Regions:
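Catalytic cores of nucleotide-sugar-dependent glycosyltransferases that transfer UDP/GDP/TDP-activated
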Residues: 1-229
Length: 229
């Protein structure tokens, strides 16, 4: 197991002993026709023996707040941060030459990863047998990300008809795009909207209904084994 997450500016690097991995850093990722430097930092969860890889870029992730400014307004570049994160994760996995059995997506910031895996990285032999699972949570933000998100994703050669949900890039539509391009879905919240619940059921994807805290570990393991591995 390896964990990948953005290196948000409110993460204390000294306390969590993050350090840059030079051999993984240094490449540029193109986001909306602009080269953005990728920095990879790593820390570990010693008791669990799990490595955590932090996808970093000064312009996208140095700010102290996570998704919104002091007024609670969404950052205008959240869409580009999501594109950068999706590409950054896959490029890092490629550099590690690690073959994941499952990529498990959590949260809307990672929701474009299944889209990029199915189109932008479709010819990567490393991922030929990798399955993608999306965990769906309740409403995470109000309003829309940048209305140009669909065009920015299309710039990477992803067909517009595959991402038509992103025409209105609200939370629910971004999650729908993730579900559509995943191999399976896990309902991770009791607070899903009826429309999102209906969408998951109608997607014909294998899905695991919500499981309580005392049961979810066993439920996830069984789901992985039966549906994916």
């Amino acid at each position: 197991i390896r964990i990948f997450m953005p290196r948000y500016g409110n993460i204390n690097e000294r306390r969590h002993q993050l350090h840059e991995v030079i051999r993984l850093s240094g490449m540029n990722l193109v986001v909306n026709d602009v080269d953005m430097p990728l920095i990879i930092k790593v820390a570990s969860i010693p008791r669990e023996r799990i490595q955590v890889y932090f996808i970093d870029n000064d312009e996208y992730f140095k700010r102290k707040a996570t998704f919104t400014d002091e007024e609670g307004v969404l950052f205008p570049d959240n869409d580009e941060r999501a594109i950068f994160f999706a590409k950054g994760v896959v490029e890092t996995v490629k550099k590690l030459n690690w073959v994941p059995d499952i990529i498990h997506v959590h949260g809307w910031m990672a929701a474009l990863l299944p889209v990029y895996m199915k189109y932008f990285y479709k010819d990567e032999a490393l991922f030929a047998n990798t399955k993608i699972v999306t965990s769906v949570y309740g409403q995470s933000f109000d309003g829309n990300l940048d209305m140009e998100l669909m065009n920015k994703v299309s710039f990477d050669g992803i067909p517009a008809e595959a991402i038509k949900d992103l025409e209105t890039p609200n939370y629910e539509n971004i999650i729908k795009a993730s579900v559509l391009h995943s191999d399976a879905v896990i309902v991770a919240s009791e607070a899903l909207s009826p429309s999102l619940t209906k969408f998951i059921e109608s997607s014909k994807k294998p899905f695991l209904p919500f499981a309580s805290k005392d049961k979810f570990a066993e439920a996830y393991t069984d789901f992985y084994k039966k549906m994916l591995l």
